[in-house]
Amino acid sequence: MAESKIYRRERYLSRLRPFYDADDLIKVITGIRRCGKSCLLRSVADELRDCGVPESNIVFLNLDRREYRSVRTIDQLGRAIDAVMADAGDGLRYLFVDEVQNVRDFEPLINAIREDGGTSIFLTGSNSYLLSGDLVTKPTGRYVETGMFTLSYSEYLGMRKFLGLPADSSPLLFREYLTNGGFPRSASIDDEQARSAYIHDVVAQIFDKDVRTKRKIKDVALFDRVQSYFINNYAAPTNLSNVIDYLHHTENVRIKRETLSKYLKLLEDAKILYRCPRFDLKSRRMLRGGDKFYLADTGIYTACNANAQISYGPALENVLYTHLRAKGYQVSVGRIGRLE
C-alpha cells in the first residue's frame, strides 16, 4: 500500500495522541507481526505533519528493511540513529524505530536518548521480549505501552470501504472475516488463493523470526507438534497434563511438563497466543488451571489447516476476545459451577 494511502486506525491513534509530544515517555507499540504497527507509526507521522512539524524532525528507522538488516548491536543502532537524525532541525524531534527487538540490548541506548530530552520516541516490536529488559526494570526507564491487534470486524469493513471494495456487512463477508482473519494487508487481496498464500507466509514468518530462530529451539519437530496442538484447540479450556497425555498416547510424542510450559510461553511472547485465565464468579477468585488460549487472529488457524472448515463457536469466541482486548479490557473466563 502506498504511503499516501494509509487506513488510520483511530482506536490506537486516540490512545497515542496525548503522548505525541511527551519526550519523557517512550511510546511502545506491541503486537503480532503484520497487525499494522508500521502503518500506525506512519499515521502518527502524518498527524504530526498536519500539525506543522517539519519533515526533518520526523525520523524513521525500520529495522526490518534491507538497509538496516545488518544493524544488530547497540553500537550499530546508535550509529544508525545518529545518521538519520543528523539533519533534524530545531525543536522537538520525533524518532520512530520499527521492530526494535531486532537489536540485542537496545534499551540503554533508547533510555539515554530519552534522558537527553528533546526527542519523542516511538518503538514497535512483535513480541514480549521488547518489554523484558532495562526499559522496564531500571528506574530510569519510563514507557507507555499500546497493545495492537489485527483488524476488528468494524475495522475490516472500514478498510474495505477505504480501499474501494464492497464493505456492506453481510453474512458472507463476516464468514470471510472469521475464516481469513484481520491481517490488514489481506483485506486488499481479492483473489482467494493469493490471500491464503499471503496469510500462510505471514504465519510462517512469525514462527521463523519471532519464535524458532530468536529462541534457538533445538527440537523444532517437537515445538511444531506443540504449536499445532494449541492452534487447533484454540478457545478450549487447557490442562497441561491432558496435553502431555494427548501427545503421548495419540501422537506418540513424549514431552516434559517444563518443556511444554516453555514452548507455550514462547507462543505467548510472540503474540501468537493470548492466555485467558478462569475466574470463579461465586468466590470472585482466579482459578488455577483450565485457562483458555486465544489466537491473535483466526487466520492463523486457517493458514495452518489448509482444507479445514471454520468452527463458528470457537471463532466467534476468539473474535469477541480480541475485540475486547483491543478496546483495552482485561478478559477472564467466568465460571459458576459447571457453567461458564
Residue ranges, per PLM feature:
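Accessory nucleic acid-recognition modules appended to NTPase machines
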Residues: N57, E192-E340
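Interdomain motor-coupling "hinge/lid" segment immediately C-terminal to the ATP-binding subdomain
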Residues: A2, S126-S128, G133-P237
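Hydrophobic positions on the alpha1 helix immediately C-terminal to the Walker A/P-loop
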Residues: L40
